[in-house]
């Protein structure tokens, strides 16, 4: 979110170089040619990748599988819980505040290694207690880095009476990643059930 604003910040402060940004529901932005996500630059990049891999005798599918084999199989999902009315809004706020004030130490067998609070602009290292700023715009979002490349992100929807739980895992195969994703999803929902 707010990718163009982050590009401008990098350009005006001289800190950082923007390469790529994305939003899970609305695409990606490659380079600084535009200030918002568009299909044109994404399509151009995909065509460039297809041409590159064709010269190597590979399809995009082959390249994707090679990346999975090299870096791991990543799977992510989202669970949204609808809570309408004044009571629903209060429950969403309560869940966010409960998580903000009581960072989980473990979810689904994964140890929480760091906790990011974008509303408070903090990243806390759970092992050392060290806190540093996120450096990103303020937003009511909590993000937990877990062991083994897993993660959880929680935020209220900006357009609907829902709270959303995003989560992801890294596996050694597609089957392993799917099993881990299902297990972490069940653990996230069990954690939420305790707060309902």
What kind of feature is each model-predicted range?
Residues 160-168:
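C-terminal charged capping/lid subdomain of soluble metabolic enzymes
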Residues 1-155, 162, 173-178, 185-196:
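Phosphate-binding and adjacent anionic-ligand microenvironments
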């Amino acid at each position: 979110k707010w990718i163009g604003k982050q590009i401008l910040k990098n350009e005006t402060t001289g800190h950082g170089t923007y390469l790529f940004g994305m939003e899970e529901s609305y695409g990606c932005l490659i380079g600084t040619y535009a200030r918002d996500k568009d299909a044109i630059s994404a399509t151009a990049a995909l065509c460039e990748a297809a041409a590159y891999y064709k010269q190597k005798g590979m399809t995009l599918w082959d390249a994707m599988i090679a990346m999975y084999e090299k870096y791991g199989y990543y799977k992510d999902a989202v669970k949204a819980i609808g809570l309408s009315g004044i009571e629903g809004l209060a429950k969403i706020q309560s869940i966010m505040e409960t998580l903000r004030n009581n960072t989980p130490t473990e979810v689904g067998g994964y140890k929480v290694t760091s906790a990011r609070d974008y509303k408070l602009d903090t990243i806390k290292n759970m092992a050392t207690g060290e806190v540093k700023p996120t450096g990103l715009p303020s937003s009511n979002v909590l993000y937990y880095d877990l062991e083994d490349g897993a993660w959880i992100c929680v935020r209220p929807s900006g357009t609907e009476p829902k709270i959303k739980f995003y989560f992801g895992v890294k596996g050694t195969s597609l089957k392993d990643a799917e099993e881990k994703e299902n297990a972490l999803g069940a653990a996230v929902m069990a954690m939420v059930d305790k707060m309902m």
